[in-house]
Amino acid sequence: ASDMGVELELVPTDWKSIVAGITADKYDISTSASLSPKRALVSGYTNSYFKLATVPLTLKKNLDQFQSWDDINQSNVVVAVTLGTTQEMQAKTYFPDAQIKAIESPARDFQEVLAGRADAHITSNVEAATLVETYPELAIVPVEEPKSPTPLAWLIDQDDQVWINYINHWIELKKAQGFFDGLMNKWNLKSL
């Protein structure tokens, strides 16, 4: 906003209606969103500026039970997801034999794990690093490798080419100036 000389206005939303907010012109740009062909049918995306992947989390005390993706894909395992997220779709694919428990925002999937109402949940490697630091009772399951490497971008109006061009040029300029690298260092993040 400061680069454009405008005032930032934050508009509350949730994941299940983030695309609808763009298409209904409730806001001009979203927070980071993983690229999704389904979303791209109705909303525009900026160029990507970061890549992440999906990892599972559980309670540290349950790590002896969960060492792989297959360990989680069991009929007696409950996997919590936040309704409307990419992880909700991924969980249904990764864990067809597990019980998928979709949580309505503002509640969060990891809270179900902390409360003992779910055995695991999946999230980005970025959020996982923050969660295990914030909640020491959580742990990242030491899977062979993360799944679904995914670029992040911002959702925008697909019919506004001037806005799309402006944001894409801004992203390119900020990449060249090290802005995104600085953010990654500040928040101890690693892009894939």
Model-derived features: positions:
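Periplasmic-binding protein-like
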Residues: K51-T58, N125, A129-E172, K190-L192
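Acidic, polar ligand-binding/catalytic clefts
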Residues: S2, E7-D71, A139-I140, E144-K147
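Short loop->beta-strand "edge-of-pocket" segments that line small-molecule binding or catalytic clefts
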Residues: W69-G84
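Ligand-binding clefts/hinges and TM-proximal coupling segments of bilobed small-molecule sensing domains
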Residues: T86-K101, I140-V143, I171-L192
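Alpha-to-beta junction loops
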Residues: G5-E7, T23-S32, N76-V78, S105, ...
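Short helix-initiation/N-cap motifs at beta->coil->alpha
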Residues: E9-A20, K101-A115, T150
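A ligand-binding cleft/hinge motif common to bilobed small-molecule-binding domains
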Residues: S17, A33-V42, Q90-T93, L114-A115, ...
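Short helix-loop capping/hinge motifs at secondary-structure junctions, enriched
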Residues: K61-S68, K101, D159-N165
